[in-house]
């Protein structure tokens, strides 16, 4: 029986992981913080030894060192690969002028999306610390993207750089807007700030989607991912699809594609 692959997505806010079997199915998943202060270490005690770890890390050197320590403690000597964007991989062609400048998380997400929705033009919107958009043609060509502050970052910037506006988290804002989003305008400052930043996210997505449909003269599936996707989705007026594992699914494909070359590991 083929050994599984351990997949790790180290984002700007937290670290997600999954174990992928020979069919590239995610059979076990979890999440943990950048530091032990952010939550307990992952419980990998029940997992079999994987063939190797495949890592997307956009969180920096300290997180890379934490991951190395965790992997060495559980599986000493485990091979590991930190992925980078390439010009071409797993059926996706990178349209960046300098392909390696594309974030590894966005690259893995593109690969995951191309496999999840074959033969379709896609606009992929991912809501994390930053909101990112990727335009992906049905033939696998990534033609470019957009990066904007995420919902939480927008609200935090207003709270930090003004004298009278509150600093709100997404949890607080989501609670404030529960049941209130049917109203286009809000009647107090916290809700006005929450809804204004949320509508800024939705407006960006809808404008980008409409521009892409017009440019390509073809249907484009809007795919949402990331922690704030549910909140933004409620503010959208266009059809969309939710997918919560694009990056991990893309990592599974990258690992499987490289497996023959690392069969001796």
UniProtKB/Swiss-Prot annotation:
It catalyses: (R)-pantothenate + ATP = (R)-4'-phosphopantothenate + ADP + H(+). GO terms for biological process: coenzyme A biosynthetic process. Its EC number is 2.7.1.33. A monovalent cation. Ammonium or potassium. Its main location: cytoplasm. ATP binds at residues 9-16, 129. GO terms for molecular function: ATP binding; pantothenate kinase activity. It holds the Pfam family Pan_kinase. It is found in: Cytoplasm. One of its GO terms (cellular component) is cytoplasm. It comes from the Bacteria. Pathway: Cofactor biosynthesis; coenzyme A biosynthesis; CoA from (R)-pantothenate: step 1/5. The keyword Protein biosynthesis does not apply. Substrate binds at residues 96, 103-106, 189. The active site is at residue 105. Keywords: ATP-binding, Coenzyme A biosynthesis, Cytoplasm, Kinase, Nucleotide-binding, Potassium, Transferase. Its cofactor is NH4(+); K(+). Belongs to the type III pantothenate kinase family. Homodimer. NCBIfam families: baf, PRK13328.1-4. Catalyzes the phosphorylation of pantothenate (Pan), the first step in CoA biosynthesis. This is Type III pantothenate kinase. It comes from Burkholderia cenocepacia (strain HI2424).
